[in-house]
Amino acid sequence: MATLLHIDSAVFPQGSASREVTSTFVKTWLEEHPEGKVVYRDLAANPLPHLDFAAVSAGAQNTLRAELADELAAADAVLIGAPMYNFTIPSTLKAWLDQVIIVGHNAGSPDGPVASIPFTVVASRGGSYAPGTPRADFEFVQNYMEKVLGGMFGASVDFIVPELTLAPSKPEMAELVPLAEASRSKAFEDAVQKAKDLAARLAA
């Protein structure tokens, strides 16, 4: 029985693009893998504390950090909803990363205990920060998540990127609505296909 660790971090419980896409991913994964298990953390509803001196000093001996590290190590795959807030990830997701990354325990080595776990990140954003766009240099979600998960854990990271999510609600972005709708449709298609691919991979 495979385990999927599902993490959401969007502050909006309803109407969140990242939550809608991660939900579609999980639904498809369970349909393809009915014996699978999903462990869910909603970091907006139940935020973790930021690291303090005691937690850093204790490392894996800290109760919370050990719990989070064990939860991650027990997963066969990880799904993370990471909407862009102020050009980067939500602070609640950063707190989870800071707590769960323990150098010398599960991080800092390319062949550590998390290296074989595939990560899928739903990186939604209100505008477009794709290569070649005017604000490409402001993209600190995909860049950061790829570097931190790949660099600290040695893990592979796959992305689903719903862009221009604010276009339908912003009159000044009206001309971008068709692009937003296309991006949204592709994100759901990607979620379904990647969930199916992951389920097949874990069942092999």
Regions found by a protein language model. Name each.
Residues 1-82, 87-102, 178, 188-204:
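N-terminal beta1-alpha1-beta2 submodule of the flavodoxin-like/Rossmannoid cofactor-binding fold
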Residues 3, 37, 117-118, 156-157:
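Residues at the starts of beta-strands that form the adenosine-phosphate
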Residues 6, 80, 119-123, 159:
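Structural beta-sheet core signal
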Residues 104-108:
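A contiguous catalytic/ligand-binding core that recognizes phosphate-bearing ligands
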Residues 109-154:
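Short, glycine-/small-residue-rich phosphate/pyrophosphate-handling segment
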Residues 135-139, 144-204:
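Glycine-rich phosphate/pyrophosphate-binding loop and the adjoining helix
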